[in-house]
Amino acid sequence: MLSSPVNLPKWLEENSHLLKPPINNYCVYNDDFTVMIVGGPNARTDYHINQTPEWFYQYKGAMMLKVVDDGNFRDIIIREGEMFLLPGNTPHNPVRFADTVGIVLEQKRPADTIDRMRWYCQNCKEIVHEASFHCTDLGTQIKAAVEAFKGNEQLRTCKKCGVLADWSPKPGSIQDPNVQ
């Protein structure tokens, strides 16, 4: 049986409490496609690598999508009303700010695909740690990987330069495009 359409403003009014850290998302549909409503703020330093594309739409406010594009670290600002299609296998860190809401659409993962969570050294940009898993429940699996990294200084120590990687961004280290 088909479900009813979602009235997004009404849904947010009634359910915004469901958008909780560290991922701040709620899965609205989870069949051939996963549709998530995502709120801010969040505070993560990991880069997610999904083998399939991800579609981002910013319903309220702007977000920053930190990416590694052909080996270069850069920030993509997705403003209110804008959408962006991220190609598969692109390391990305979605940064969401207070009072922002977006929609993310992902394909259901084929059985042979592996998602990865990668942390880079803020000093030398080497990979500090990588966790991998077949994604069946994005919210719980990403949260578990983030919590494991947060709680283990050995995982967070760069083997190249010895710097302890941050598990969350330092206050003030990310410019909020909503206040410029």
Swiss-Prot record:
It catalyses: 3-hydroxyanthranilate + O2 = (2Z,4Z)-2-amino-3-carboxymuconate 6-semialdehyde. This is 3-hydroxyanthranilate 3,4-dioxygenase. It is found in: Cytoplasm. Belongs to the 3-HAO family. Catalyzes the oxidative ring opening of 3-hydroxyanthranilate to 2-amino-3-carboxymuconate semialdehyde, which spontaneously cyclizes to quinolinate. One of its GO terms (cellular component) is cytoplasm. The gene is bna1. Its cofactor is Fe(2+). Its main location: cytoplasm.
